[in-house]
């Protein structure tokens, strides 16, 4: 019968669907049978297995019932003399019981120790090996402590009981230190120097108990072992003194009582006899302490040793404590956790003396933390309760003149009690009393009396250091009150609160709530609180440095990183300085995350951080002007030379501004200037000015991180122009010319670039550009530069997006040009001019070329050009420039349709179409052509497009062509035609100009992405009469219009919505749903792409086929640019039968998929951003899908894999992510589910678990969920689906560290439920997840 019950019990315990109460009832039923009946041998294995399952349970009721059943079961088997079965079956329980010895609950640890005690009767060697050979030498401090207590209890309890002669002999061997115990003496003595204070004190007490009656030989062996392990002196003296006094227990118990009464009560009685004498209260309170010192010196036989700097909870004078306890005869506490932090003075509460007879403390204690506190010892929990009960009335109500002194005395009494034995020997009563008085204690802490508040804070510190994790339940209310205290205005109280919070964090158990408090303090508006929080965070990192998982798994690492970033960029320098030390502590624990923070700092902050004394790599980094400061850290630059140079530049500028204006002769005619160009070029070359980018708001130097203050009177210096070029030059004042010349020589601002007139000749343009860039490249970093702050918001926006210093080119670099056969001149690499490459000059600034200086634009004066035939009124220059800009002026966009000379130029012609909003591409001067070639520079994500005031044409290869160089360009234009810099470019319908004026050009402004083909001959420009007009509408005020970023393919009429910055955390990168703003941007990209038109040559099927072959080859070699992809899209849309066979389609599609899943490369593309290039790749793939779904269906799995892999390169707010999601939806609707699921699983299973790879995992799980959702919606079950593989993957992601992955995994499991026949099969497919995961899935399945 019992065999059947045992089998049913095992089945019930293994059934995860059965409730805990039912399992406990089954176990109790079997335990009742064990207590009443003999156990058959056939039922023994089943009962042992059921007990193992019960003890391993996480439910306290079930594990407790298991321990209880084990105790009765072992006794029954020993009564039946089945020792061999016990020894055999208990081997499966040993590892579990050793683990339970280190449990955080004391009750579980005690039950595990008792189980080992019961098993010891049947298998002593195995039990001792588990307890003393494994737990005692392990890493768990609780297990060590419990194993020593078990050893002491076994040695004492069984000698009293005397169950059998065998047991008595065995224990006598242990007590006499025979062979059974001698092998564990070394491990026991090693625990005397353990890192945990509780283990040290327990080891000391255990050694004393075991060696009390030992032989001299055993004591000598003990001394030798302690010397070998270098045990601290205080422990050695206390142990030796205790085992020496333990020879006659009866004497030690009878003698010291009278001595104790004489020694303890004598000072009190003398104080009472002197009570009638009128003395000060302070004298009365201090007399008992002096008598106690005299009494102590007469009782103690050894001098007090100075305390060693050990851990917070370690004892300081254990010798005096142990000797006094034996002398007074107080019963030794049964707990081993005696960690009294006592000083040479103490008092003992007698059993009969009331609380009122205690020596009164000093009314004005010192506020120092290192003051000496007289430890107060109690002998029962009843006395602890009485002490707290007597204190309760003093803390009621508000603080007054009557109760504050009593509160002060009570708090000091609590400190003495905390330093005594109450927290260890009578911990429940002590902690319960603290909870009742906690409200009153914080009334003292928050008192306006500084002394009272100080002793309250010291009490909290003592409690934290003494009790440690035992006050975890009170930490929340303590942190709230102490942080409030730290934010107060009183410096002493705030400092005390800071020290108290630090002690609390250091000693209690770490929880996420503590980190939330610290993180909140880091972001508080109170500067003092943020300053303290930096130290708290450092303490927290140091405390948890060996337990990083407790911070990482709870989301605390992100919270900590956010706090560090916040304080490193704090407005207060003190907070920044305090957080630098904390940062390097953070760096030692999480170096990779710290490097990310360091790399995102500005140069000045990074330099100060690297120079901090706490930097562990400070000895490795030498001060350099440039280059990386150390391996693994971000590159840093020295700003010392830059600061001095900046000061010199400011002084020189001020001196020039205060200098009197000198008259200068009018500029010479153009012919004269050309003849004397060599002479005049020497002066600007010797100056320290540098020509820089026209958008003057750009941050061009890292000399100072502070904003540059604009001059008191902003000036716009004029460019020096020939007198023959401007009929109104006489109106310009002499003072203006003088200030212009001085500004050119000193500040080097872009608007003050001095150059001579540019003529159509090659030499003039080249010499002008090189003359302004005569300084070497190496001297640019430390050269002072003046930042001209513009009034428009466009400049301010642009300022925040460039932070790198701009080095200048020497003369020899100015002659560089792009080779004639470089990729820039290939079929699919025609570079359009971006809006950012045009000038933002003032209305009075002369017309100029746009020239690139190492990736930045400079203004070079151009000769007067005549574009319009409409004459200008004589007083037109005196009018407001905005009146001219208000007139809608058409802009001519030309497309060359003449036959080309080669296939090379044919495709180039076809690629020149009108597009808008291209990514910025500045220009660069070269010497062999008047056309300014393009050199690709790095792009910012939010660049601001600008307009130009120069009247040159921007060509298809990024060039500027003077209007005077064009044939028949004799029309005049208004000087201030494009004076309004904030006017956006709007797209108007195409129109054809008058054929009678083929060369009449209305403007030189080019829309980005609208190239004009220029022949290789430098004097030949082929421009067709067909034009596209873009008008400039009038705006009321240019100050309120900010030109924001427009991505490629986006129409000019953009939505006026704030740009959402890319988030750095993975939590924001949820795959579905994509935010509406990103979807809106993607729709605009697709709509703009549909407007792409093709040239007549591309309409020829034969030519189109040739272009397609060349395009495929360029995609494979990764030399295709944005315009090439648009050309391919136009060809595919126009020719329905462009793919004559499936092989050509497959070749094209595979090349596109390979390009899509490759990493974006900034350096590879000469045109546009990598994001824009990948957008065109994705649009081409979508077009291939729409063009022929039958051909595409064979590559559904390959395409989905490429989409999932490509997802990891983009943030969630990139518009291309919306395109990836929509393309995946289209493929899901077309594909076969079984093959696609395997392909997606193959991709995401191999991904690494870092932040970038999680993007692919998120999208992959989302794709799988949508596939199953589609099948469930159609109510069809596909037998070929890899359900087992899906279930295994979903179950593994239910416990992932990323919450978004867990959320999507739950959705996948819910959809998977609809594909499985029944519940049992469903849980089998998921691998029988844990109970909490099962409950969560059940909830969502039922909710569905």
UniProtKB/Swiss-Prot annotation:
A Gene Ontology molecular function term of the record: microtubule binding
Low complexity bias (residue ranges): 748-769, 995-1004
Database matches in SUPFAM superfamilies: ARM repeat (SSF48371)
HEAT repeats: 93-131, 508-544
GO CC entries: cytoplasmic microtubule; microtubule organizing center; mitotic spindle; mitotic spindle midzone; nucleus; spindle microtubule
Domain of life: Eukaryota
Compositional bias (Polar residues): 691-705, 735-747, 828-847, 914-942
Cell compartment(s), UniProt: Cytoplasm, Cytoskeleton; Nucleus; Cytoplasm, Cytoskeleton, Spindle
UniProt cross-references to InterPro entries, sorted A to Z: ARM-like, ARM-type_fold, CLASP_N_dom, TOG
Key words of the record: Cell cycle, Cell division, Cytoplasm, Cytoskeleton, Microtubule, Mitosis, Nucleus, Repeat
Any single GO BP term: astral microtubule depolymerization
Record region (Disordered): 265-292, 606-637, 651-847, 914-945, 984-1004, 1031-1054
Assembly: Interacts with microtubules.
Family of this protein: Belongs to the CLASP family.
Role summary: Microtubule binding protein that promotes the stabilization of dynamic microtubules. Required for mitotic spindle formation.
Protein name per UniProt: Protein stu1
Species whose genome carries this gene: Aspergillus fumigatus (strain ATCC MYA-4609 / CBS 101355 / FGSC A1100 / Af293)
